[in-house]
Amino acid sequence: MRLYNTMTREIDLVETSHPEVARIYACGPTVYRDAHVGNMRTFLVTDLISRTLRYEGMKTIVVQNITDVGHMADDTGLGTVAADKMLAESEKTGRTALEIARYFEKVFHQDLARLNIYPADYYPKASESIESMVNLITTLIDSGNAYVGSDNSVYFSAESFPSYGALSGNRLDELRPGHK
């Protein structure tokens, strides 16, 4: 199989660390509401790649995370701080964040089945990895690769990463702070 390599901007042969196994990680859903077409596209593309590799004789191991806690986002594009999506939905519906997460996780799997998208082999939940995330964040802050902003959120320090922008094509000197 050949895929477009964003780093080299060329179409390359897919190579794996083990000749007969392709390990694939793809972002999974944030389970605070129904998935939309844009979300499902990600899962469909992952499924198509996995099916193609299996058709070519490779074993695939697919992992998709379930974000069931702590999803902060600025969906406005205006640089405003948005509420945690799980907590906002909890306040709106009167259900606990866990009840919401488990309900929409179930709906997500039903949607995959309806679309004939093969399920991933593993679905680790963010809520199961909080301690390791906190440890990693602490390490990033201590090493100068992340910092705490004025809003008490933790941000990655792009300046600390010499090859920042190699994948996206962005250059730090051309980016405007606070803009997407």
Task: Give the ranges of each region predicted by the language model.
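NTP-dependent nucleotidyl-transfer catalytic core
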Residues: 1-180
